[in-house]
Amino acid sequence: MKVLVTAFAMDAHFNGVVPLAWALRAAGHDVRVASQPALTDSITRAGLTAVPVGTDHQVQAAMGAMAPGVFALHLNPDYLENRPELLDLEFLEASTSMLTAAFYAQINNDSMIDEMVDFAAWWRPDLVVWEPFTFGGAVAAQVTGAAQARLLWGPDLFLRVHDRFQQVLHEVPAERRDDALEEWLTWTLERHGAAFGPEVISGHWTIDQMPPSVRFATARPTVPMRFVPYNGPVPAVVPPWLRADPGRPRVLLTQGITERSTGFTGLPRAGELLASIAELDAEVVATVKAEEREGLPPLPGNVRVVDSLSLHVVLPSCAAVVHHGGAGTWATAALHGVPQLALAWQWDDVFRAGQLEKLGAGIFLPPHGEGASAGRVRDRLAQVLAEPSFRQGAARIRAEMLRTPAPGAVVPTLEQLTARHRAPAGQGVRH
């Protein structure tokens, strides 16, 4: 079958779709990956066929213009579990409107969607797999009659909030309802002669890469799939020093791809943090961009600073990892049974870090304020290294992940679902 994989142009979001694209290709299916031109090199470096569509997004500027109150709540989404009273109609309408204008419609700009639809109408995919924010893929599937699947890289906070929004929205008269996301998608679909349907929000089914203990319960069709690490542009090379026994616990300090590429960061200053962690009886490996190394103070001999390193290469040798809470870093550490100290501060990172702590596989340390000083990070890391319970908790999550089918094993299920959901030939709006 023909499979169109779609992800907006950001490496961290693209990396999560690569192993499934490989699996589909290895099973003999024809795979194309559509995104804005900025992602083309990343797609082709992954050994996949790129379809550049539209113009590059300017999402960082748009996000910077968001209303501070709404932005702050989305940066710290613990309100989902701990402050449900905030999830009222006024807040949900405002946040949906703000995110639609400043995020969803930016990363799925009109030119990107239009050219993606044009390509799909020409190529006729049987299945469209879309990264959960890349609604352009959902639109292309809806217009052409392809089956469509959302591919999650983290807990499904989006649909959890969306479902709550739909619940409170339908408690008020129709004339008072304001759903900016549905309005934007309806307008976009109508431009291409298609109608809105719930699958444009949720897919015909969802492919979930999270371990069961971190998933939200849902009645929607879901295909569990094991997370397989792919670190994108970071060279997957095993350096000679990695094969040597350090003689003490090895600790990795990493900011992750998104933090390094966007400048958004929740970690304390690298030099201060490294100097403090180096006081522990551990070998410290830190990924620090070359331009930032000049500002580092002299560091002791137990600190090794590298520009970049594939996580799946180094983490199996580590006793702990300190990071920003990002999806790829979190999941790669979990897959290798490595205890984590997560300095999470935004989006689903906060929820994922909280679950990590609840499951006894690490510690969640919010990075802002006095809570995450370099000394506090050092002390909590010492706790993670000293207490065996953290490695036991990490081992339990690893076991969950290993029991989940790998990407290659879910391909037959995707074939069956595609046959069930795709429109018969010639019945799409564009055919």
Swiss-Prot record:
Transmembrane segments: none annotated. The keyword Glycosyltransferase applies. CDD domains: GT1_Gtf-like. Residues 1-23 form the signal peptide. SUPFAM superfamilies: UDP-Glycosyltransferase/glycogen phosphorylase. GO terms for biological process: daunorubicin biosynthetic process. Keywords: Antibiotic biosynthesis, Glycosyltransferase, Signal, Transferase. It catalyses: dTDP-beta-L-daunosamine + epsilon-rhodomycinone = rhodomycin D + dTDP + H(+). It comes from the Bacteria. Its EC number is 2.4.1.-. It is an enzyme of class 2 (transferase). GO terms for molecular function: hexosyltransferase activity; UDP-glycosyltransferase activity. InterPro entries: EryCIII-like_C (IPR010610), EryCIII-like_N (IPR048284), Glycosyl_450act (IPR030953), Glycosyltransferase_28 (IPR050426), UDP_glucos_trans (IPR002213). Pathway: Antibiotic biosynthesis; daunorubicin biosynthesis; Antibiotic biosynthesis; carminomycin biosynthesis. NCBIfam families: glycosyl_450act. Involved in the biosynthesis of the anthracyclines carminomycin and daunorubicin (daunomycin) which are aromatic polyketide antibiotics that exhibit high cytotoxicity and are widely applied in the chemotherapy of a variety of cancers. Glycosylation is a prerequisite for biological activity of anthracyclines and requires DnrQ which seems to act as an activator. Belongs to the glycosyltransferase 28 family. PANTHER family: STEROL 3-BETA-GLUCOSYLTRANSFERASE (PTHR48050), STEROL 3-BETA-GLUCOSYLTRANSFERASE UGT80A2 (PTHR48050:SF13). This is TDP-daunosamine transferase DnrS. It comes from Streptomyces peucetius. The gene is dnrS.
